[in-house]
Amino acid sequence: VHRRAFVTGTLAALSLGSCCSSAPAAPPVTPGDDRFAALAGMCDGLAPIGPDERARRRERAQALMQEHGFSAIFFEPGDSLVYFTGIRWGRSERPMLYLLPARGPGAVIAPAFESRTLRERAGEDLAQHLWQEHESPYERLAEALRATGVGGGKLGVDPWTRHFIVDGARAACEVEIAPATPVLRGCRTIKSASELALLRRANEATKAALRAVSAHVSEGMSEGELAGLVHAAQIAAGLTDTWALVLFGANASFPHGTRGEKRLARGELVLVDAGGALHDYQSDVTRTWPFGPVSSAQARAWQAVHRAQTAALAELRPGRSCEAADAAARAAIAAAGYGNDYGRFTHRLGHGIGLQTHEDPYLVRGNRDLLAPGMTMSDEPGVYLVGELGVRLEDIVAITEGEPEVFGPRAGSIEAPFG
């Protein structure tokens, strides 16, 4: 790959990426908000994933590569890089790639001027194949393949890798390139005891934060103001990278929100979908509760969603399909009189969770993948009545050998939404 072709392809990819809209900024929060002091220390006592566990992950990946016919896999900065190496690195137009062969140690392909920074973050033992600014990083990738004894075969790529990098690698390496999904999914969907502990605590912390915030909801406050409190409470509990979606009344009939911000009035439902990270592992919790008197329509919708969540839990057992839980929840919503299919339960039941808030496995019609112990996912049915209300309840669930484990208390009733 000539340097000119590399630069041209990179610029084209960046110009396409600039068209994407960015998420709204988090509302300002006041550090050390005394209202949430009781949450302090919730996330203490758990260590991040260490180098020994990451080494076992790489060994597992290599076994899966051999099983599925991959000579090597590579990926750029992101969750897979963190998962296997612990290296955190931002993506830019300059490729930084990690190569893991089916046998032997991995290597990194990086800009030469970043070499010392890489050694600080990854240690001295990681082999580096460095490229100067006028050179092609993909030639260095081909060089790294030869150095690790991979002269041909199938090269796996993380599905989240940008297209211009895949194109550059394909042209320079002259090998078959295929998605490394069987390897990455085979490693990341089954959580270790350490991962489960982090996910459990993160979700317990978000639930405690939402309970604490509910005591400070007041008439006339805006969705953004309440979101700020949710951020502050989660930070007080020890989470990082917090986020919050707050919707009042009819705005909650948009599952992921609407542009018009609303102020809270008595008699409306409050929907909060929130989360954060504990040592990179995510929480994702939704609660819906009333502010003031509860109408019969609100109570009926809330109860239907709670029953649907319970019906789905009964299907979250090892050996059952991902689509079975979605079907059970959808049947419960229909039985409550809210129509079949996607009419008022407009989205899939759930998604996997780990380093990413949304990852495999997905609980959706057509996904016949089988559940297995160690998988973690959301159980989040909803009912959305346009122009009137929205109700969603979401808990993170771990598949076990028997009954599923729900991380933190489930909602008890519309009057006791925090368990």
Segment roles from a protein language model:
Residues H2-G419:
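Active-site neighborhoods and metal-handling regions in enzymes and metal-associated proteins
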